[in-house]
Amino acid sequence: MHHTTVALLFGGRSLEHEISVISARAVAANIDRDRYRVLAVYITRDGGWYAGGVAEQILKLDIADLIRTTSLEATAATLREMVAASAEPPFNFDFRGIDVAFPVLHGSYGEDGRVQGLLETLQVPCTGCGVLASALTMDKALTKLAAADAGLAVAVSVTVMSHAYRRDPEATHRLAVASLSFPMFVKPVSLGSSVGITKVNSESELAEAITHACSLDSKVLIEQAVKGREVEVAVIGNDTLEASPCGEIEPGSEFYDYEDKYIHDTAKLFIPARIPGDLQEKVREAALCAYRALGCRGMSRVDFFVDETTGSIVFNEINTIPGFTPVSMYPRLMAAAGTGFMELTDRLIRLAMEPEAGASA
């Protein structure tokens, strides 16, 4: 029996490196080995690609537990030491033997169209979105513009380039205070997992938050805080789409930040979301609208703020490679829709191998 070879890409150069490893471990455990041959491909923080060998060893590590019991820095050091000890050369595999790639690369250099473009050039089908949708949705500011153009409500915001802020920080402070009211959120535009996001409650906190975000990204979004529940929808499909039931996150801290997600595990998840049924249907319709407007394929998780007292639905962001960790919403939402984890990976691989309408041979 022929087994389709799936290259599971994980790690990567972004600040979400360790989260990618946790996601990949869950994906690897839920791919049907009777149907697929999995080739683990680990990408180091400095861009080295390693297949098999040390990549397989890293997948066996319980990275989530390592982060909780030691630290993020110690975990990163462990991964570096494992690669060095293996003495394997990077780029030790041939793309020609791969039938489909399954990138579980969160953040820059993985979720932003770069890897998707490489795979497309090599004519290797890839799970999830293509180059354009991946690049567009990686930029929170551009995503909001596209969502608003599609008729979705978005939070009021201002965008600043990091170099412009360093040149004249006071101009940015004046613009933010004149355009928005407190509380605000300051966000690097291209990072996920809530990395670098700060909630700002007063003008005295603004400079530190923007400086921090500018140290992580070339562009920063300063956004009006939105009242409402954090509601998420999983979407799957290419031409024919399916939206999951709505899920809700109740943060364990002021907002659903990196530590709340992956270290303290204090957030509460509710499926279905605690909003009326008719409002849930409107959120699901809005998720499908965003998915289509942004040109998504394969999968995405679409996030909103929902106020059940006013019926307000505000688009927040879309994740084209959502988390697949044990605490991640995307696989949980798909399970609530009747698609278990192993069936989910199978569907995503099959969707990747469908030809895109209008694509040249």
UniProtKB/Swiss-Prot annotation:
Cofactor requirements of the protein: Mg(2+); Mn(2+)
EC number: 6.3.2.4
Residue span(s) of domain ATP-grasp: 144-350
Main location: cytoplasm
GO molecular function: ATP binding; D-alanine-D-alanine ligase activity; metal ion binding
Binding site for ATP: 177-232
Chain ranges passing through the membrane: none
UniProt keywords, alphabetically: ATP-binding, Cell shape, Cell wall biogenesis/degradation, Cytoplasm, Ligase, Magnesium, Manganese, Metal-binding, Nucleotide-binding, Peptidoglycan synthesis
Domain of life: Bacteria
Binding site for Mg(2+) 2: 317, 319
Reaction catalyzed: 2 D-alanine + ATP = D-alanyl-D-alanine + ADP + phosphate + H(+)
Associated pathway: Cell wall biogenesis; peptidoglycan biosynthesis
Subcellular location: Cytoplasm
Binding positions (Mg(2+) 1): 303, 317
Cofactor binding annotation: Binds 2 magnesium or manganese ions per subunit.
Family: Belongs to the D-alanine--D-alanine ligase family.
PANTHER family hit by this protein: D-ALANINE--D-ALANINE LIGASE (PTHR23132), D-ALANINE--D-ALANINE LIGASE A (PTHR23132:SF25)
Function: Cell wall formation.
Protein name, entry field: D-alanine--D-alanine ligase
Native source species: Chlorobium luteolum (strain DSM 273 / BCRC 81028 / 2530)
